[in-house]
Every structure is written in structure tokens, then in C-alpha cells.
């Protein structure tokens, strides 16, 4: 298993000007420190799996840009549709209808290009998601992580590809801290001071976990009796704070399933067993 060092950790040992010799000296000095932390180097297979997620993320951002441009151009002509997929489908139908006289010839020629690009992006996103699902079905650890509420196929696939060897973390707390789902510390003089979450880690994983936690919280609001812990937290803490707390718990649970095996069991089922 190969490990590397973070540039940020080596920087503290660099003396004055930066050059190859000074860099090598700093690396040699840093690697001998007993408290130095190392980064596990991802395999080519892991990198390929994560490229699927990154590419999908880029295409989704491009799709959002195209939709916003299409809505803005048509709104200039007084054509407005509802939010969501239904509204986008309505706008695409208007663009495709040659008999609709609300669109001038030049305007139609422009928005047809946007509509065609939007359709192409939808096809590409679908093909990538299909491949991610195939990888997920062939990965036993990913299927176990998916059993956690709020972590779907995308989340499980991304977590297991990013942290293929969970034993590099001492505990689920370390894993959650590595993702950046713990408070940032600014403590001194024996006085503990905690701030917002550190956000030091994989932004993609953190976003997937928080979005999944928000989905679970919405279900908890609709069915409070099924989620007593979340209901109590929501009664005394802001919604987004609870979402991050739940995302932290989801990350720790995912680490436990990857490190020790098994599938997720709801607290009441675990107590009954």
C-alpha cells in the first residue's frame, strides 16, 4: 500500500526559498516526524470510479447553466414556465413547436441549439449514472453502505471508492473529521472554542452526505414518530445544523459498515435483536 504526504504538512519544514534541494530536505525532515500524517494513494481503479462522479458533476452543472439560459431567453419574450422538470419540458415543447408564433425566427434558431444541447447532456448523464450503478452492484461494500438512510447509490459508490481501505482511520469519528463534518477548533489556554464545521476534506463527499441528510430530515418532519432523535434535535436546533449533525452520523455509520461488515439496522431493530 502506497502513502504520500500533503504539501500543506511539508510546507512547515521548508526553509526560506523554494527549490528542489530545499523541497527534498523538507520532505526528508517531515517524513521522520512521529506525528506526521500520510495520505493513502488511490489505485487506478479508484481514480477511474471517482472520475465517473466528477464527470457527472460537471455535466449536471452544465445542464443547470443551459436550463437557466433557456429560461432567461424565453422570459425576455414573455414565455415563462413553472419551476422543476415539468416547466423545462414545457419550454422544450414550445421551442420544438414551429407553429408557436411567440418565437421570432432568429430567437427560435438560438434556443433550438440550447434545447439540443440540453437533450445531449441528459443522455450523457444517464449513461454515466448507469455505469455508476453497474459498479455499485458489483461492489459488496457499496451495497452495504447504501442501506444507510440518506445514502443512495451515488453516495455509497463515492464513499467506497474514496475510502477503499477504512482501516486507515482509527474510528468513525476520524472518518467524519477527514470529510470535514466536525466543528473547527480555535482553543487556547485550556478553554475550548468550537466554530462552524471545518470543511477540510472531500467537498463532493461532504455535499452528498449533507444533501442525503436533508432528505431524511424532510421525511422526519412528515413522520416525526419514526425519527424521535431527529425530531428532538429539530425542536431545539436550526435545520441546517441538524442536517450536518446527521451527515456526521451517516459518515460514522458508513465507516463502521465498511470496517466491520454488516448492514444498517434501525435503532429499534438493533435493540430488539
Regions found by a protein language model. Name each.
Residues 1-273:
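A detector of single, family-specific signature residues
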Amino acid at each position: 500500500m502506497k502513502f504520500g504526504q500533503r504539501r500543506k504538512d511539508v510546507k512547515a519544514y521548508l526553509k526560506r526559498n523554494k527549490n528542489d534541494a530545499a523541497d527534498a530536505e523538507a520532505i526528508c525532515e517531515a517524513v521522520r516526524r512521529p506525528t506526521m500524517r500520510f495520505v493513502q494513494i488511490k489505485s487506478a481503479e479508484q481514480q477511474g470510479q471517482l472520475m465517473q462522479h466528477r464527470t457527472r458533476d460537471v455535466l449536471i452543472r452544465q445542464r443547470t447553466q443551459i436550463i437557466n439560459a433557456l429560461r432567461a431567453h424565453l422570459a425576455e419574450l414573455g414565455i415563462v414556465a413553472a419551476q422543476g422538470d415539468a416547466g423545462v419540458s414545457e419550454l422544450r415543447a414550445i421551442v420544438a413547436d414551429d407553429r408557436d408564433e411567440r418565437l421570432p425566427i432568429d430567437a427560435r434558431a438560438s434556443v433550438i441549439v440550447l434545447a439540443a444541447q440540453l437533450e445531449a447532456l441528459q443522455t450523457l448523464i444517464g449513461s454515466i449514472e448507469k455505469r455508476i450503478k453497474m459498479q455499485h452492484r458489483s461492489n459488496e461494500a457499496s451495497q452495504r453502505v447504501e442501506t444507510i438512510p440518506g445514502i443512495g447509490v451515488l453516495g455509497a459508490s463515492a464513499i467506497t471508492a474514496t475510502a477503499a481501505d477504512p482501516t486507515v482511520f482509527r474510528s468513525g469519528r476520524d472518518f467524519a473529521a477527514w470529510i470535514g463534518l466536525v466543528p473547527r477548533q480555535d482553543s487556547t489556554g485550556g478553554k475550548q472554542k468550537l466554530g462552524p464545521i471545518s470543511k477540510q476534506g472531500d467537498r463532493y463527499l461532504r455535499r452528498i452526505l449533507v444533501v442525503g441528510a436533508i432528505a431524511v430530515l424532510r421525511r422526519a418532519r412528515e413522520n416525526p414518530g419514526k425519527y424521535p432523535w431527529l425530531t428532538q434535535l429539530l425542536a431545539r436546533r436550526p435545520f441546517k445544523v441538524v442536517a450536518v449533525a446527521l451527515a456526521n452520523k451517516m459518515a460514522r455509520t458508513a465507516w463502521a459498515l465498511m470496517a466491520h461488515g454488516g448492514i444498517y439496522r434501525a435503532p429499534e431493530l438493533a435493540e430488539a435483536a
